[in-house]
Amino acid sequence: MPKYADYLKFIMTLLMAVSMNCFALEAQKSPEKIRIDGLANEVSWQLAKWQPINSLLLGDKPSADDFSGQFKVMWDEQQLYLLVEITDDVLFDQHADPRHLYWDDDCLEIFLDEDASGGNHQFNFNAFAYHVALDNQAVDIGEKNVDGSDNFVLLNDHITSVWRRSEKSPNKVIWEVSVRVYDDNFTMPVKQGMPNQNKVPQPVNLFSGKKLGFMLAYCDNDGSKEREHFIGSIDIKAVKGNKNLGYITADVFSQLTLIDSR
């Protein structure tokens, strides 16, 4: 019986490890500075592997020409680099105010947890849920306003974003993003929506072996009042039927390890 129990324990540990590895990603260090221009013509991108964006988190499953996507991720000491290739037959941005109902417009969503510690981040900066809009502005939810209302903030200092459609059919969207990584000490005033002038937050330096929490997703809307599809890089386990949990908790992020195999 003890041998059987030990064997069962070993199998369970192995299954857990395999399960965790299914959600683990590695990002290769870029040997050059990547220019964010939507062209993706740096040789460095050839060192990174494509990863799918194919897990339905909200809405019904879109057809391949309605939405399909994949991404690559790299890094250097100053930032993460993302190359996202998207098939989207209709690009839609219905709200002029970048902070108003931004999740119902087409946007790229970058989830990032600097120390991979997990936990709630819905109304704080324990982790970030950057919604990068078609106008290349980045929005997240900050601490609540004094009156208790939600506080949607622009974090454009964190993100550099450029996209363009390919001239070749089927005219995919080529979206390049660089992300300066901030830890959970990041703060900003509740009302002004501007970085604290007394102590301007600084991004962390990245290094080989560092682990971050990470997930990528896309909000797709072809002209409806609300988004029609929400597709991510991770198949999140539903809680009470809800998979749209990334903006609430970093516990659902995958683990991204920065490596340098040169």
Stretches with model-predicted labels:
Residues F23-R262:
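Structural preference for beta-rich elements and adjacent junctions enriched in aromatics
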Residues P2-M12:
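Bacterial N-terminal signal peptides that target proteins for export
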